[in-house]
Amino acid sequence: MNIRPATHEDDGFLREMLYEAAAWNPDWPRERMIAALADPMLERYHRDWGREGDAGVIAELDRQPVGAAWYRLFTDEQPGYGFVDEKTPELGIAVVPLHRRKGIGETLLRALMVQAREEGFQALSLSVAVHNRSRMMYERAGFEPVREEAEGEFWVMRAELG
């Protein structure tokens, strides 16, 4: 597996991975999946990719992208789902379904955390459904709950990068 920096050319793949992350539960009814994918707020996570504060990594197998992890800064006026503050980038991460549960997500997460620390960020944040298996990966990486959203269905989590 190769891990490389995300570039402008990865915009389409990042968008795909964003929707994979948003529609993470294969047991959801079709209507809920469609609603999640149609949420205009998701566009905030990839529109104008490459602006200041954006960074990401892509996992490749045989030169094909199989996963991505990225972060973006948000503002108080236009926060993301996992917004903590304007100095803490919010991350997104997803792996192509065929390649899940092989350690790719954890490798991407660790690489992105190193990159964020090297860029001078003190922490990263995210939003995750409480029942999403990925939550355990985030906890292993040092993410801790900051608050609950949607009546406890989602957690906003934060990890210090120190």
Predicted regions and their residues:
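Conserved acyl-donor/pantetheine-binding loop and adjacent beta-alpha core of acyl/acetyltransferases
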Residues: E52, E60-I93
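A short, internal acetyl-CoA/4′-phosphopantetheine-binding micro-motif in the GNAT/acyltransferase core
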Residues: E90-R101, V128
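Conserved acetyl-CoA-binding loop-helix of GNAT-fold acetyltransferases
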Residues: R101-V114, E139-R140
